[in-house]
Amino acid sequence: MTTTTTMAAAGADPRSAITPITCDTTGTREKALASLLEQIMDSYSVSDDEKPLADAVEAFLRSKPHLTVHRHGDTVVASTSLGRPRRVVLAGHLDTVPVIDNFPPRWLAPGDPLIREDVAAAHPGERVMWGRGATDMKASDAVFLYLAATLVDPQYDLTYVFYDHEEVAAEKNGLRKVAEAHPDWLAGDFALIGEPTDCGIEGGCNGTMRFDVVTHGVAAHSARAWMGENAIHKAADVLNRLNSYEPRTITVDGLDYREGLNATLISGGKGTNVIPDECRVHVNYRFAPDKTLPQAKTLMMGADAGAELGNGEHVATGGVFEGFGIEMKDESPSARPGMDAPMAVSLAKLVRERTGREPLAKLGWTDVARFSLLGVPAVNLGAGSPLLAHKHDEQIAESGWRPWPASWRTGSPAARERGSGARVGIRAIE
């Protein structure tokens, strides 16, 4: 592959099957990781188009005799069965958000104008992988695939989860479907989600809910406005309540979570000369993990409003939007950081030693919440900057993941580099 050239064949259908994934462990770890990243970056896997990549990941994992592999839809789960006293789950999603002129991917040589200034300053003289999914989260997926291939005798049993539909509505999420159909596949004592965190720990996550706040009026011709009631004008009170909301920062298990309540969409009206009889303000509430989902809903609409996903509009009986109609659109629980779990404490110590970084709160929602519901402590830890996720110039420097996989292997440096059969393990949870 030539630097600064695209990796996919010109004119090829990006949704077609990809070549088998391989991992050459005869060279350095860095070379193997770069090769794995190239291979999975070259697969177009926007949500709903993950199947070719899932097929290739499944075939790769089934070629490893130390792993037992299961598949549910386009989610692939591989695990060791060594009878170790504890099990760690490593999970990463295969899908990406839609491309924005950033596929096929490419390696950028030092000095290429497509390299961001902040990336060039942090990683001078390095190649940079540019393209959709580089940080969110194929760099972490590449690390997981490398570990799956090389950790043949880990200190603890391991489960690798590569799942689909993380970037879309919760009901399509592959991890959610596995948790419902095969929760035993996800059993463990600790879980790690490879969301981009610049190789630092981000604990837990804020919960999120989306709902329409609905105002009603009476339609009339705008020439005779007094014959109607303007629903859009009534929405002014909704906006006033949003403007008066003061975001709180809440400390949970030593980490600071900032909440937010914002209008993200507004719609109303059926014609330019018609007084609107309905207006909808779409609201997103991000709440700290000191609250359950029902408690968060109570703060927004009261304890007995009755608004649930799919059951239409209900009147808020209390909370911020008391008196207005509420129609739920999406909801996901928060997750406590779990930083008091023994494995989390050990991992935090290791990350601190290698990077100097202390754990932070995860302000966005991630699938750590699904593991929390299963009773499995989980944290976010992955390669790449979260600030570049979903951006048109998404990219990661070649050394952007090095602090991370190096943290997960033990044994002599020579054994680590050649990927030998020397006893290896997850040092962070010994």
Locate the predicted segments by residue:
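Acidic/His- and Gly-rich active-site-bordering loop/insert found
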Residues: 6, 11-134, 152-155, 349
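Metal-dependent amide/peptide-bond hydrolase catalytic core
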Residues: 11-22, 49, 203-204, 210-430
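Buried hydrophobic packing segments
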Residues: 57, 141-151, 175-178, 235-238, ...
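Short gly/ser/thr-rich secondary-structure transition/capping motifs
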Residues: 68-72, 173, 194, 262-266, ...
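Fold-independent oxyanion-binding glycine-rich loops
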Residues: 72-74, 92-94, 164-165, 194-197, ...
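Hydrophobic/aromatic beta-strand patches that form the interior of the parallel beta-sheet core
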Residues: 88-90, 161, 192, 377-379
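Phosphate-handling active-site elements
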Residues: 113-127, 147-161, 184-187, 242-252, ...
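Acidic/histidine-rich catalytic neighborhood of metal-dependent amide-processing enzymes
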Residues: 137-210, 423
